[in-house]
Amino acid sequence: MNQTLVQYDTRHGGAYDRGSADAYYRRSYNPHYYRGDSYSSARVDLADMTADEITAYTAGYRDQEESGDFKDWD
């Protein structure tokens, strides 16, 4: 059986990174990313994302949730 390993761009501010961060901080699923670094560049929201970007965000969110590693707020 052939399996294709999908690799995502994990740069800070990218779709995968933002999905991962949202899940880590227990924020709701809300696809977005930043054109450059998080919070210091233009934000791209769901309506303006490509299918591949949404897939990357979703993968980051899912992977982080599956890891079981979340921010401890205590």
What are the language-model segments listed below?
Residues 1-74:
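Intrinsic-disorder/low-complexity detector
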